[in-house]
């Protein structure tokens, strides 16, 4: 008799769980995996554009203006001498010399010849190369031209920053100082990579060296803004954990003098149903600007809305490490390579039905990303990555209640791609188009799925809508830039988004009649008012053009405000 009430309570709990499950089965219940994915969308960094041309020196001969056509003579041979008056091989100049040798030439023609030789070497990576027609007596039709390719002279450093002199020396030794000559691509790479170092501004200055044909390099480095912070509010959260979110963060550069950077980000939703903390520390580790970093992330959540009765809550811990290398740095092309490892511990509970799930995920990701000034006034961005993962899955659910495809251990592979283009148009207009997507080799756990909805997806649908194993997104946007106030810019835009995907890679366990594919699309308009380094206010509204998500809102209104210090 005393046992009956206890069994009655258990039976009631099971019954409650069944009823709740039936009522919400059509909805995607957020968990630690999907909520982490939503935050990863928020953490996407702005894309870096190539800088454009750094050095554009043309070889203007000092003789051209003073030489007239004048007396001509037959040119039989041209001797090219280096700065030590040693004759150099001229095979690479044959296509230039053939236009002069064996013909009647004047001093003006010889000046043009020297100019062409200078231009040839400058276009072939010798930044300050100069061909000079020295004073000489021309005998038997032989003319001597002095070729100064631009040898590396003295490299001096004026460092008024927290960046270590030793690091700057190592970086110069792998670029400009690695060659006998001042090579354009190496000098550009040095200038670009040192200006990529957070917390510093760098400038380069070339001057004539002490010896003939030498060029000295002066490196000037000053501190930029080493400490920065921000506070932001937005309504981009999940409706089951709180739409409104408050975030704050800080960043400190050059703590150890090796271009290191420490970043801390904190976020909480309204009523604190979602809390997240993330820390990232990285430092340059060699003279090739390779960066090593470590990350840690903590998330805690509790669901409301339709899932409140389930008493759903959970938390996750993520630890990671990465290597980032600037593989290619030129004025018009950037390519970076990144390898990262992450270890995740995910825990989810539905306390009303006594269900607890634990997952451990180890993943290794290798990828590239970059940008290219391929078209005038336009920049193309791209990225490719492959993730290899291992999942260990535990659940307290009885076997008869678990999904048919549940596996305690599994391996998976995920492929991601992104391609976008930004084109500046006349009259302060611009057009953006982009496509990104994901492929998988099997059905994925929620932390690896692609989210089609949200501000980074189809903007007419809420954050977290349509979580798919494989999917593709197309976004187009037409913008107009208008300077306002003293330093602010008002950007107005019209956009269209389209997304499609498969909820599950392997659909063999789905019941008949359950649709495994989804297509979303929306149109909208937005306004953005910002002052770089000070504040940004973004407002947009989007309307779905589909009816493929149950209980979807008729429109989405997105708002974010950020203040930087």
From Swiss-Prot:
Keyword field: Cell outer membrane, Ion transport, Membrane, Porin, Protein transport, Signal, Transmembrane, Transmembrane beta strand, Transport
UniProt domain comment: Probably a beta-barrel protein.
Gene giving rise to this polypeptide: hxuB
Domain POTRA: 73-150
Subcellular location: Cell outer membrane
InterPro entries associated with the record: Hemolysn_activator_HlyB_C (IPR005565), Polypept-transport_assoc_ShlB (IPR013686), POTRA (IPR034746), TPS_OM_transporter (IPR051544)
Record's protein name: Heme/hemopexin transporter protein HuxB
UniProt lineage: Bacteria, Pseudomonadati, Pseudomonadota, Gammaproteobacteria, Pasteurellales
Any one Gene Ontology BP term: monoatomic ion transport
Pfam families (UniProt xref): POTRA_2 (PF08479), ShlB (PF03865)
Any one GO CC term of the record: pore complex
């Amino acid at each position: 008799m005393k046992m009956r009430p206890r069994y009655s309570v258990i039976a009631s709990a099971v019954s409650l769980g069944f009823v709740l499950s039936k009522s919400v089965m059509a909805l995607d219940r957020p968990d630690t995996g999907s909520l982490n994915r939503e935050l990863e969308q928020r953490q996407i960094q702005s894309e870096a554009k190539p800088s454009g041309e750094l050095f554009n020196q043309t070889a203007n001969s000092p003789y051209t203006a003073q030489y007239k056509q004048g007396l001509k003579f037959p040119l039989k041979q041209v001797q090219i001498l280096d700065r030590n008056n040693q004759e150099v091989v001229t095979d690479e100049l044959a296509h230039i010399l053939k236009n002069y040798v064996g013909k009647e030439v004047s001093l003006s023609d010889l000046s043009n010849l020297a100019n062409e030789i200078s231009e040839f070497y400058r276009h072939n990576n010798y930044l300050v190369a100069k061909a000079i027609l020295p004073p000489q007596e021309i005998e038997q039709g032989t003319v001597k031209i002095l070729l100064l390719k631009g040898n590396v002279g003295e490299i001096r450093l004026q460092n008024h920053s927290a960046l270590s002199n030793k690091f700057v020396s190592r970086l110069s030794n792998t670029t400009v100082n690695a060659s006998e000559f001042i090579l354009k691509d190496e000098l550009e790479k040095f200038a670009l990579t040192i200006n990529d170092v957070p917390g510093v501004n760098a400038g380069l200055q070339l001057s004539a060296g002490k010896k003939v044909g030498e060029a000295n390099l002066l490196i000037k480095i000053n501190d930029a803004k080493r400490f920065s912070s921000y506070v932001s509010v937005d309504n981009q959260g999940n409706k089951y954990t709180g739409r409104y979110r408050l975030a704050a963060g800080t960043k400190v550069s050059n703590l150890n003098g090796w271009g290191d950077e420490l970043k801390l980000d904190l976020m909480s939703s309204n009523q604190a149903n979602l809390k997240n903390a993330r820390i990232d520390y990285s430092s340059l580790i060699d003279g090739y600007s390779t960066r090593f970093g470590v990350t840690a992330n903590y998330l805690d959540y509790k669901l409301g809305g339709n899932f409140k009765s389930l008493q759903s809550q959970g938390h996750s811990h993520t630890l990671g490490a990465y290597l980032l290398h600037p593989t290619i740095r030129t004025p018009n092309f950037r390519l970076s390579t990144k390898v990262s490892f992450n270890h995740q511990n995910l825990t989810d509970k539905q306390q009303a039905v006594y269900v607890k799930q634990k997952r451990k995920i180890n993943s290794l990701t290798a990828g590239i990303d970059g940008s290219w000034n391929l078209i005038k006034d336009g920049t193309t961005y791209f990225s490719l990555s492959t993730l290899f993962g291992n999942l260990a899955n535990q659940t307290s659910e009885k076997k008869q209640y678990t999904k048919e495809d549940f596996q305690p251990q599994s391996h998976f592979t995920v492929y991601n791609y992104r391609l976008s283009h930004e084109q500046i148009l006349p009259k302060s207009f611009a057009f953006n188009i982009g496509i990104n997507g994901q492929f998988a080799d099997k059905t994925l756990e929620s932390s690896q799925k692609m989210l089609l909805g949200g501000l980074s997806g189809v903007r007419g649908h809420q954050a977290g809508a349509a979580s798919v194993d494989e999917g593709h997104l197309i976004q187009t946007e037409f913008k107009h830039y208008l300077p306002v106030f003293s330093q602010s810019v008002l950007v107005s835009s019209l956009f269209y988004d389209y997304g499609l995907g498969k909820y599950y890679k392997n659909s063999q366990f789905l019941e008949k009649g359950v649709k495994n594919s989804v297509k979303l699309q929306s149109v909208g308009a937005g306004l953005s008012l910002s002052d770089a380094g000070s504040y940004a206010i973004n407002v947009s509204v989007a309307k779905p053009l589909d009816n493929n998500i149950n209980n979807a809102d008729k429109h989405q209104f997105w708002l974010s405000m950020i203040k930087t210090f």
